[in-house]
């Protein structure tokens, strides 16, 4: 072929556009939502030379193959668990169903793959110092097994402190298992993991890649944050392991986040969620520990694990059910506000029902494109009657939902398409008036440090900013 021919580049561009048409048709048939299909198809048709390779990396080509593989691994894991006679929650599940509070969860117990359980104890952990002080203190007392899972682990001061603590516990004979997301922790040096392995800690990266093509598939990420110590004490929430979560990032400080400390039968569900991810990464089961007895009182809890391999879109349906169930209020905090059409419609309908709908988002960006898309959605929400607030002191990263007077949810799930359909997430649902009062008090303080977005703000935005927001929203389904 004559590469210097005047026709060569014409043929090449024609071939690229033809491939773009094929890829656009593929997106229309395989992407799960209309918004996502359009967000891929239009750029593939008009600028394929810029979007073909990103579509191969982030698109839907291997989605269904991955779903099949993940479900098969989960099935194998549960067969292995059945041999352990792992049925720890029968009595607590029956007690939960007999409780008057159970009705407040409505569809949640059937939506999640794990039951609502009674007799749990929960403690709110506000911001990084309280969270990591509690986690480190729990690990310090470990005698048998420590399970640690984070989306991001940094090799900084906090990361090194965790590393040294885990090495010390492993040297004492404690079995330590660490799981991190390969994409989220892309900056973690191999030496960090190797030092842990050399010290007896079992550490693995969670990756969705299987086979030659799937090595390019980086769009599914494990966003869960789980710590379980000896089957007795657990932690989930929004924090990852890094100095910025302690407020050490100058541009984002002070960092605002929330975790929750848990004890009781629901820890079996946290262990099962960890076991699924560990089994996918290693094809082995970690040790699972159950206490001999549980307290006879406590609060109703349900661990809601969600991910792209679920039979239905668990995370987005959770937000829909939470909003639809609200009769008095629904308050949501999320670092990103990119609702799909169904969730946005649910928010508007809640306003029309007279529900106090509030959403708290950051005033500072950590991802500028996502921030721009969130801003446009926020302006549209304000016009629909939703009260939108921007947290002023620093970056807001917490993921909290408060419904009426009893139901609260704290976990890793953001109010965006990535959490709805691409990430593995975990959230703790709690039905308890006393704990909900604590969450309400915490959120009241956050709102006091926030500025409400007004209709005037939506009008004062420069036209170039509006254009940028609309472009960001166009690609928001694939962010």
Curated annotation (Swiss-Prot):
Membrane topology: Multi-pass membrane protein
Organism annotation: Pseudomonas putida (strain ATCC 700007 / DSM 6899 / JCM 31910 / BCRC 17059 / LMG 24140 / F1)
Reactions catalysed: 2 a 1,2-diacyl-sn-glycero-3-phospho-(1'-sn-glycerol) = a cardiolipin + glycerol
Entry keyword set: Cell inner membrane, Cell membrane, Lipid biosynthesis, Lipid metabolism, Membrane, Phospholipid biosynthesis, Phospholipid metabolism, Repeat, Transferase, Transmembrane, Transmembrane helix
Disulphide bonds in the chain: none
Active site as annotated: 223, 225, 230, 397, 399, 404
Gene symbol of the encoding locus: clsA
GO biological process: cardiolipin biosynthetic process
Protein name as annotated: Cardiolipin synthase A
Family in the record: Belongs to the phospholipase D family. Cardiolipin synthase subfamily. ClsA sub-subfamily.
Domain of life: Bacteria
HAMAP family for this protein: Cardiolipin_synth_ClsA
Annotated ranges, domain PLD phosphodiesterase: 218-245, 392-419
Transmembrane portions of the chain: 8-28, 38-58
GO MF, any single term: cardiolipin synthase activity
């Amino acid at each position: 072929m004559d590469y210097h021919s005047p026709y060569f580049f014409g043929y090449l561009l024609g071939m690229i556009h033809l491939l773009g048409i094929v890829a656009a048709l593929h997106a229309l048939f395989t992407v799960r939502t209309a918004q996502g299909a359009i967000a891929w198809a239009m750029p593939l048709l008009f600028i394929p030379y810029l979007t073909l390779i990103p579509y191969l990396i982030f698109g839907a080509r291997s989605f269904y193959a991955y779903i099949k593989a993940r479900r098969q691994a989960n099935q194998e894991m549960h067969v292995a668990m059945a041999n352990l006679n792992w049925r720890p929650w029968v009595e607590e599940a029956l007690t939960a169903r007999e409780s008057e509070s159970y009705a407040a969860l409505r569809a949640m117990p059937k939506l999640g793959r794990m039951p609502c359980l009674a007799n749990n104890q929960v403690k709110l952990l506000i911001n990084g110092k309280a969270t990591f002080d509690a986690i480190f203190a729990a690990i310090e007392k470990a005698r048998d097994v420590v399970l640690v899972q984070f989306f991001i682990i940094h090799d900084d001061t906090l990361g090194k402190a965790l590393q040294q603590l885990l090495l010390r516990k492993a040297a004492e004979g404690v079995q330590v298992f660490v799981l991190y997301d390969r994409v989220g922790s892309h900056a973690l040096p191999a030496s960090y993991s190797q030092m842990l392995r050399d010290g007896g800690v079992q550490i693995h990266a969670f990756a969705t890649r299987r086979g030659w093509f799937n090595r390019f598939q980086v769009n599914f990420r494990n966003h869960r944050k789980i710590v379980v110590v000896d089957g007795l004490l657990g932690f989930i929430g929004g924090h990852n392991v890094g100095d910025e979560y302690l407020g050490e990032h100058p541009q984002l400080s002070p960092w605002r986040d929330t975790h929750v400390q848990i004890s009781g039968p629901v820890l079996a569900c946290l262990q099962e969620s960890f076991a699924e991810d560990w089994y996918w990464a290693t094809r082995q089961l970690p040790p699972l520990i159950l206490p001999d007895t549980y307290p006879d009182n406590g609060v109703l809890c349900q661990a809601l694990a969600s991910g792209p391999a679920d039979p239905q879109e668990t995370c987005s349906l959770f937000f829909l059910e939470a909003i639809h169930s609200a009769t008095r209020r629904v308050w949501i905090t999320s670092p990103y506000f990119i609702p799909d059409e169904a969730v946005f419609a649910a928010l508007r309908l809640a306003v029309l029902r007279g529900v106090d709908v509030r959403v708290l988002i950051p005033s500072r960006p950590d991802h500028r494109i996502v921030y721009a898309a969130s801003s446009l959605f926020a302006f549209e929400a304000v016009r629909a009657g939703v009260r939108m607030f921007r947290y002023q002191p620093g970056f807001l990263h917490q993921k909290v939902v408060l419904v009426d007077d009893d139901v609260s949810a704290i976990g890793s799930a953001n109010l965006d398409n990535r959490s709805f359909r691409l990430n593995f997430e975990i959230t703790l649902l709690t039905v308890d008036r006393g704990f909900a009062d604590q969450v309400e008090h915490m959120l009241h303080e956050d709102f006091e440090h926030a500025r409400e977005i007004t209709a005037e703000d939506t009008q004062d935005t420069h036209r170039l900013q509006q254009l940028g927001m609309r472009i960001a929203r166009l690609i928001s389904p694939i962010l």
